[in-house]
């Protein structure tokens, strides 16, 4: 707090938080202790996601067992967690693991994918325990959280993931088709015709876009196709409006320094789902001039991306609804 650096996380010290600058453990502050819980759940999320990709890549059953064991542990505890918001009170936007239903939804969106990947090695009783202890209680919580904009987009993503995991089409239907809060309602209300999210900033555009991609991918197994023209435009618009160095301008309430390269994993999915779209191929090639292709989403793609060394000569573009324009000359 004095040196403006993040505390070093220690699994064994939930109530003592080490500052690398002053070499001191900070104790006696409940807000720091609550933050430790937040970080612990986030580390577990990363662990489950990594195990999912490792199991898919290697077929080694041990990674599926890691997923099963952690989810069984969560299932034994989740219902004991109190509903709370960021002030540790019961509120309309609180969660159980996190102080925001937004974070609860994001966690569920990916963790349910890990569950589905590992489900085949689980017994009937283990599946029932995870459903009763985590999947069903979390879905009930999120069904009570009716918001707008990026919050609701993530609520829907979490609900879709939970609905698919539970094979419950009624949950999926609410998340997609609810006239006020569903996926289609949010897409209609907040995505402009030129593809930009209503806030008009890459910083805020990609946050709901990832939830929408997760939603679209999740329901493919239920024979629902959300990969329509509007989602395509949501992916293409910011990519079309990037600087030659693959950084975004600082428009609306965003800020300069936002890198397009940080979003390349989303275009691995887009390239595959939109039938090897040539623009998305060019996007991937340009990004991989600057970074390694080591994203988990590349495993889902399983397609060779030819390397290029030259900068792309993308055309000038005018986003009529948003009011942005990019003038280009060759690669500049």
Please give the residue ranges for each predicted region:
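Extracellular glycan-targeting catalytic surfaces
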Residues: 1-147, 153-160, 176, 180, ...
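Carbohydrate-active enzyme catalytic cores, enriched for enzymes
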Residues: 160, 166, 204-332
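Secondary-structure capping and boundary motifs in well-ordered enzyme cores
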Residues: 43, 100-103, 151, 179, ...
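Short amphipathic alpha-helical interaction/hinge segments
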Residues: 78-82, 187, 191, 242, ...
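Inter-helical turn/loop segments and adjacent helix faces that build the functional surface
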Residues: 57-58, 118-129, 166-170, 218-227
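Alpha-helical cores of eukaryotic small-GTPase signaling modules
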Residues: 158-186
């Amino acid at each position: 707090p004095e040196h403006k650096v993040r505390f070093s996380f220690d699994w064994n010290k939930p109530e003592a938080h080490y500052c690398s600058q002053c070499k001191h453990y900070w104790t006696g502050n409940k807000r720091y202790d609550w933050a430790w819980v937040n970080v612990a759940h986030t580390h577990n999320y990363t662990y489950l996601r990594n195990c999912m990709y490792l199991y898919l890549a290697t077929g080694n059953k041990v990674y599926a067992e890691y997923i099963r064991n952690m989810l069984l542990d969560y299932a034994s505890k989740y219902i004991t967690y109190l509903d709370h918001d960021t002030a540790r009170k019961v509120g309309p936007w609180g969660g159980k693991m996190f102080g925001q239903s937004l974070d609860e939804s994001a966690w569920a969106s990916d963790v349910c994918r890990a569950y589905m990947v590992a489900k085949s090695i689980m017994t009937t009783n283990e599946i029932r325990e995870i459903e009763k202890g985590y999947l069903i209680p979390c879905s009930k919580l999120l069904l009570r959280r009716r918001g707008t904009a990026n919050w609701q987009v993530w609520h829907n993503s979490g609900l879709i993931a939970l609905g698919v995991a539970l094979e419950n089409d009624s949950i999926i239907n609410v998340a997609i088709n609810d006239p006020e809060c569903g996926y289609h309602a949010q897409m209609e209300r907040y995505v402009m015709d030129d593809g930009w999210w209503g806030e008009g900033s890459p910083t805020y555009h990609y946050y709901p876009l990832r939830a929408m991609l997760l939603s679209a991918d999740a329901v493919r197994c239920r024979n629902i196709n959300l990969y329509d023209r509007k989602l395509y435009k949501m992916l293409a618009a910011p990519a079309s409006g990037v600087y030659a160095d693959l950084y975004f301008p600082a428009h609306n309430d965003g800020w300069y320094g936002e890198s397009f390269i940080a979003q390349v994993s989303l275009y691995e999915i887009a390239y595959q789902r939109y039938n090897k779209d040539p623009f998305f191929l060019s996007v991937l090639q340009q990004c991989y001039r600057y970074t390694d292709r080591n994203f988990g989403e590349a495993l889902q793609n399983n397609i060779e991306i030819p390397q290029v060394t030259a900068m792309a000569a993308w055309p000038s573009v005018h986003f009529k609804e948003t009011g942005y324009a990019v003038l280009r000359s060759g690669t500049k």
